[in-house]
Structure formats: C-alpha cells, structure tokens
Amino acid sequence: MKKALYLGAVAFSVAFSMASANEPKIDFNPPNYVEETPSKEFIPELNKLGSLFGQGERPLFADRRAMKPNDLITIIVSEKASANYSSSKDYKSASGGNSTPPRLTYNGLDERKKKEAEYLDDKNNYNFTKSSNNTNFKGGGSQKKSEDLEIVLSARIIKVLENGNYFIYGNKEVLVDGEKQILKVSGVIRPYDIERNNTIQSKFLADAKIEYTNLGHLSDSNKKKFAADAMETQMPY
C-alpha cells in the first residue's frame, strides 16, 4: 500500500513538473552583444557663458528626452499579430505479388540423372504468393489566430551602449479585483526614434521582448489543469 502511494506521488510530481515545463516563458536578460558592448562614457560639459541651455538639474531650456542610465522613457506598446495556417496529407501504399522458383530440366541420355533431375524439380515446384498489404493515411489541420495588444508603460534605461543606443527594461503590475496583470518589456532603442515628448513606439525596439500575463481565478478558469495537460502530453494516441 505504501509503495503504491509512493509511486502515485512520484507520478503526480513528474506530471506536474512536465506540465510546468511546457509553459512558454521569456528570458528578459540582455542579449549577449549588450553585455559585451562597453558602456558609453559621459564627459561632463562646462557651462558656456551666454548659453540658454544650462547644466543644472532643471535648466530652463533642455532636452527632456531620456539620455542616461536610470532615465525614464514611456513605451507605447502597439502590437498586432495574425496567423492563418493549413496543411493536408494523403498517403497510400500497396504491396503484393507472386514468386516462382526456377525449373530444373535434364537434357542428357543418362536415365539415372534424368530421374534425379525430375525428383529435384518436383521438390522445387512451388509458387510463393506474397500477401497483399494496403495502407491509407489521410490527415489535415488548420489554424487561424489574431491578437491585438495596446498598452502604455514606463521603462528605465539600463545601459547606454558605446554607439549611443539604449538597452531599456520596463515592468508594470496592476491588481484589480483579485486579477493581477503583469507587463514586461525590454529591448534596444536608438535615441533618434524617441519623440519630443519622451515616448517611443514598440515597433522601434530591436530584440524586443514583450510579455503580458494575467494571474487570478478568472484567468485560471481559461487554462487546463496541470494533471489533464500532463496526461494529454504523455498519451501515445
């Protein structure tokens, strides 16, 4: 009894682990080239007499766009994705036939050898008929999907690369009536693509990673239970 319970617990644990491993995930660590590229060195500029652009914390005239590490920038996420896929397969095969062994004939005058040849020919006088085999397979499938995502969030400049590009990362969490919404964005942007109001469209993000997740009872009701998912994954048919 204990052994059966132990085996059941092990099977349950394996099924849970395999079901969890099948969930898609995104790694938000910076790409390798971002880690390998040196950071840009910022050389402090001296105040210029008569210049309208001051060097203080809040000068009267200044570029309000994000420029340095830890500066904030607003990302306008506008992503649309659609896919239409169909496939079909039809396979047929058949096999069958007969096999006849060669005949043995003696054309000489020796009666003994003639009888031996007739005896051997009689023993070898068989036909082999191969059984017929027919195989048919037909399958197909289609998929159509469309998704729209429109969200605005703020991100922080993590690193300014040597060529002036920024690696940014943003995280936003909203909890409404027990439902938690999590949005994560990361990518590399060019300073020239930042608007004057310090916003940038998500289409300008290179190596973009965008993750939108819902957590709560409502979102759980739209997902398969891990046990059912694990069983369907391991079923051979």
Swiss-Prot record:
Domain of life: Bacteria
Predominant localisation class: membrane
Swiss-Prot/TrEMBL keywords: Bacterial flagellum, Cell outer membrane, Membrane, Signal
GO biological process, one term: bacterial-type flagellum-dependent cell motility
Region (Disordered): 87-111
Pfam families to which the protein is assigned, alphabetical: FlgH
Record has Ribonucleoprotein as a keyword: no
Signal peptide: 1-21
Compartments it resides in: Cell outer membrane; Bacterial flagellum basal body
GO cellular component: a single term: cell outer membrane
Keyword ATP-binding (UniProt): no
GO MF, any single term: cytoskeletal motor activity
NCBIfam families for the chain: PRK00249.1-3
Subunit structure: The basal body constitutes a major portion of the flagellar organelle and consists of four rings (L,P,S, and M) mounted on a central rod.
Role noted for this protein: Assembles around the rod to form the L-ring and probably protects the motor/basal body from shearing forces during rotation.
Family the UniProt entry places it in: Belongs to the FlgH family.
Matching HAMAP family: FlgH
Protein's name according to its UniProt entry: Flagellar L-ring protein
Organism: Helicobacter pylori (strain ATCC 700392 / 26695) (Campylobacter pylori)
Organismal lineage: Bacteria, Pseudomonadati, Campylobacterota, Epsilonproteobacteria, Campylobacterales
Name of encoding gene: flgH
